[in-house]
C-alpha cells in the first residue's frame, strides 16, 4: 500500500494486487484519512471486479457524510454496473478532476 498526500487529497495505491488485504489495511487506517479527500487507486490490480468495488461502499458513505470526496480508480470493469453511490473513474487525473468539482459544489453549498 502506497500513500501519497497532496494538499487536501490522499491517494492510496494498491501495490500488492491483493484486494482483500488492501481493503483491510485501508479500513483499519481509515480514521487517519477521514478528514481528507480520498482516492483509492486500484488501476494496477487487473483482477478487481464490480463485486470487490461494492465492498468499498461503507468507506465511501463515511467520507460523503464527513463532506469529503471518495473516488476509486479502476480499469477493466463495467462502469455501468457500479453502484451510483460509488464514484469510479478510469484514471487518477479524472479522480482529481472529480474531487475538484465536488469541492467547488461544497463551497457553493450544493
For each of these PLM feature ranges, what is it?
Residues 54-58:
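Alpha-helical scaffolding segments of alpha/beta enzyme cores, especially the outer helices
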Residues 87-93:
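Short acidic-hydrophobic, aromatic-tinged amphipathic segments that line or gate anion-handling sites
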Residues 96-110:
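A charged, well-structured terminal subsegment
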Residues 8-9, 35-40, 67-71:
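Hydrophobic beta-strand segments of well-ordered beta-sheets in folded domains
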Residues 23, 27-53:
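Short, glycine-/small-residue-enriched flexible loop/hinge segments at domain edges that mediate gating
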Residues 1-27, 44:
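STAS-typified acidic loop motif
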Residues 60-82:
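Short aromatic-glycine-(Arg/Gly/Cys) micro-motifs in beta-strand/loop hairpins
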Residues 4-6, 31-34, 63-65:
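Flexible, charged surface loops at secondary-structure boundaries
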Amino acid at each position: 500500500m502506497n500513500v501519497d498526500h497532496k494538499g487536501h487529497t490522499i491517494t492510496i495505491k494498491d501495490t500488492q494486487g491483493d484486494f482483500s488485504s488492501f481493503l483491510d489495511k485501508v479500513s483499519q487506517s481509515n480514521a487517519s484519512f477521514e478528514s481528507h479527500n480520498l482516492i483509492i487507486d486500484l488501476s494496477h490490480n487487473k483482477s478487481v471486479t464490480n463485486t470487490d468495488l461494492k465492498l468499498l461502499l461503507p468507506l465511501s458513505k463515511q467520507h460523503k457524510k464527513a463532506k469529503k470526496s471518495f473516488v476509486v480508480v479502476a480499469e477493466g470493469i463495467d462502469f455501468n454496473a457500479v453502484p451510483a453511490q460509488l464514484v469510479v473513474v478510469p484514471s487518477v487525473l479524472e479522480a482529481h478532476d472529480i474531487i475538484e468539482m465536488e469541492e467547488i459544489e461544497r463551497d457553493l453549498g450544493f
